[in-house]
Amino acid sequence: MTDTKTTKSKTKTTLSQKQKTAIGIGLLGILLIAILVGVVFVFQNKTDEFSVNTGVDASTLTGDAQTLTVGEDGVEITSGGIYELKTNIESGCVIVRADNADVELILNNVSITNSDGPAIYVESADNFYLQLVGSNTLVATTSSDFNGAIYSKDDILIYGDGSLDITSNIDGIVGKDDLQIDGGKFTISAEDDGIVGKDSIKVTGGVFDITAGGDGFKTSNETEKGDAEFTGGTFTINTGSDGLQIIANLLISGGTFDITAGNGSGTTSTSSQWLGSNTSDSSSTKGIKADSSVQIDGGTITVNSQDDAFHSNGNVTINGGVINLASGDDGMHADNDLTINGGTINVTKAYEGIEGGTITVNDGDIKVVATDDGFNAAGGSDTTSGRVGGQNSFAGDTSKVLTINGGTIYVNASGDGLDSNGNLYIAGGTTYVDGPTNNGNGPIDYGDSGCEFKITGGTLIAVGSSGMAVNATSATQTTVMINLTSSYTGALTFGDISYSPAKSYQSVLISSDKLSLGSTYTLKINNTDIQSVTLNNVITTSGTAGMRPGMGQGQQGGMQGGGRR
């Protein structure tokens, strides 16, 4: 990893006095200096411009490694080169003080136990490479000053075909600069965080089983860097806090993730989004969280989280992958823009399924089950819009937009099916909505005065209660809403259009290019004629819907004081 630093201070550790006096152990044999070109992480501000430039991969290094001789309290490495540890360290550590030189350490079927600090401590080096051979174990009881079983002040790259079992009373692996992992099998049990790369994290491969009281993976340099990229690997992560907690941008383009955060979706979130408190007052238990942006280009991701499954204080972009989410709060949440360009998304459980300041669906296969809204274009952080009714500050905000341009969408919501606190546009795709059975919500909802619900293409079938049901305000293809005098269950047909709702319904909204203007159609439920409608206008309403307070009949859905949108 390229580093422009010319000097590094040799700050002494606070390890045990025995370890400090162990310096000076003789190193036998011929020292082979490895010529290493650093690994440079190049992250752009926009997530679609993520790139990583790598120099010489550590796995291509050649030459014989020098075998380390273990002293009473461990080993100290003071110059660059390749070193191999084949002997257990029962009470001590490996310390690297090599100034600006590159150092590679090979762990070959060893165990290191240190009750007074890290098992491996890199105080100074240009780049530190750790190769795993065979089965290796690190056990560390450390302090807040050196808070990882592996603690490196400089860039670190870990690779190899071996395994590493880490037990730590604080963090598992800590890199204060850039941290890259290209392979290996990791089992980490940490009372706080599993793996921390302050400046950046890049994972291209490996198998990870992480149990952490804090976060699973974490970056923390909020002033300059803090990005993370995952291109491969298999991850099983169980955390007391967030599964992935990235201070800047997160990109996932490959890998298989199984993340359980907090107590999982079986526990309803009680943090600020419910109580209106500051998030610092309670622990975050999100599955995947990034302060700036989350971008998913590929991979298979399964999240079971107490709080949001996906969360960004900025934007969320889904370009591909297979994503399965269960959440005690939101399935996906972006304070700003949430864009879905492809992939398969299945939100099996959530309070609100997919939420963002703006939501744009261009493609993808999406299924959402939510106890409140399925899609909610509301915006703002969870901390600014509490769950308590009447606290919503986004009603009638034309900057909040839900747009569906393509894809296949299914929503089963107990609240509003598709909800925008501003405008709602459907221009393509196929959208099915099983909306609420209660009359306090509707299959479709959009903002107050000045906002619109416009249909210019695609297929929409939305069913649910009639109390807050709304039709489109404008359309370029034939659209009809039928409100019935009583509730029905069972399959419906309307001309060539058919659908089998999952629950009872009293309102049916259909927009499709299969409907012909001027034609008469009969709504059939369970093969029984229920109601005939002649489509004399592009937008037709048959039957009576309820109205929300202060609004004209059928103009809007949802209640202004009826909970967060």
Predicted regions and their residues:
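A composition-driven surface/loop motif
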Residues: T2-R565
